[in-house]
């Protein structure tokens, strides 16, 4: 067990996870600017891209590259500097560190070494898109980028098709049409989806419709910019595999309680899942759980 007290005096340096704007420089926070000014080093996914940001805010702190191609080599170097007392900020090209970039491995290494990790709140494409999508904002399931190979992509989509939560994906412009075709095949043409592009920028755009409607738009439009895809969850899906029969020895009340404790669900959500697994009406499970009747 490791209990971190983020702002107590430390014998080592601190790793700061600093989010950067996803398109609009006005989304940079005062705290992020101050942190980047005060740390000893900035570990950047792309030093050239980050230098533009630093120049804009007149930040003079030195950088070191830290990306998927050199992360294993760099982690040891960064840990050594942190252990020697240096404070380091880690930034991605845009948005929140550790989300679809190698920052997670550095965080794990810091925790294993007893080094304090301090996250700063800020810009994030997934949540920005979700709250304006019009689809259910919770529960949601963030997946990120789908696999590149079609076979692997189809398999991933088949798994996602079982999920009742709203699903969040990232996608590049040159793959968008093919991904939408595969989504239509697996999820069904009538599944609701929202494409979000150029978030926070001048040409920010939301395309809302069914998969068939959105695919038709993509076939006849110029596809530019990075996309965030928000897909409606499967209302018939379940968070838990049907073949799991470990609940057979439990009462309905015990089953609901187990769901709440093990999967951090509210009673309403747990009752819904228990009803699916046991093939009962939700009203029956509700009554049994609350000892009604």
PLM features: residue spans?
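A contiguous loop/helix-start segment that scaffolds small-molecule binding in enzyme catalytic cores
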Residues: 12, 166, 173-293
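Short glycine-rich anion-binding loops that position phosphate/pyrophosphate groups of nucleotides
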Residues: 22-23, 93-97, 173-175, 234-236
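Glycine-rich, flexible N-terminal cofactor/catalytic loop recognition
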Residues: 1-66
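Conserved helicase motor
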Residues: 66-72, 146-149
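Glycine/small-residue-rich loop that forms an oxyanion/phosphate-binding "nest" at active or ligand-binding sites
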Residues: 78-124
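Class I SAM-dependent methyltransferase SAM-binding "motif I" and its flanking Rossmann-like core
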Residues: 105-160
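Loop/turn-to-beta-strand initiation segments
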Residues: 14-15, 85-89, 165-166
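Short active-site oxyanion
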Residues: 36-42, 114-118, 166-167
């Amino acid at each position: 067990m490791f209990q971190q007290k983020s702002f107590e005096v430390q014998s080592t340096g601190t790793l700061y996870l600093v989010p950067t704007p996803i398109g609009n420089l006005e989304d940079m926070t005062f705290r992020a600017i101050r942190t980047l000014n005060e740390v000893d080093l900035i570990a950047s996914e792309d030093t050239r891209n980050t230098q533009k940001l630093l120049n804009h805010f007149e930040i003079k702190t030195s950088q070191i590259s830290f990306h998927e191609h050199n992360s294993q080599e760099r982690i040891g170097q960064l840990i050594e500097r942190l252990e020697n007392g240096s404070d380091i900020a880690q930034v991605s090209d845009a948005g929140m560190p550790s989300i679809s970039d190698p920052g997670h491995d550095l965080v794990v290494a810091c925790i294993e070494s007893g080094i304090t990790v301090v996250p700063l709140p800020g810009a994030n494409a997934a949540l920005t898109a979700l709250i304006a999508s019009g689809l259910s904002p919770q529960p949601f399931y963030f997946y990120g980028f789908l696999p590149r190979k079609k076979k692997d992509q189809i398999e991933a989509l088949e798994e996602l098709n079982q999920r009742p939560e709203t699903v969040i994906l990232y996608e590049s412009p040159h793959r968008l049409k093919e991904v939408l075709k595969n989504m239509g095949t697996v999820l069904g043409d009538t599944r609701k989806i929202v494409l979000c592009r150029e978030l926070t920028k001048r040409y920010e755009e939301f395309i809302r419709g069914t998969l068939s409607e959105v695919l038709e738009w993509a076939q006849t439009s110029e596809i530019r910019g990075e996309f965030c895809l928000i897909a409606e969850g499967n209302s018939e899906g379940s968070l838990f595999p049907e073949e799991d029969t470990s609940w057979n020895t439990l009462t309905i009340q015990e089953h609901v309680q187990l769901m709440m404790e093990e999967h951090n669900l509210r009673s309403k959500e747990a009752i819904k899942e228990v009803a699916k697994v046991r093939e009962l009406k939700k009203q029956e499970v509700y009554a049994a759980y609350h000892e009604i009747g």
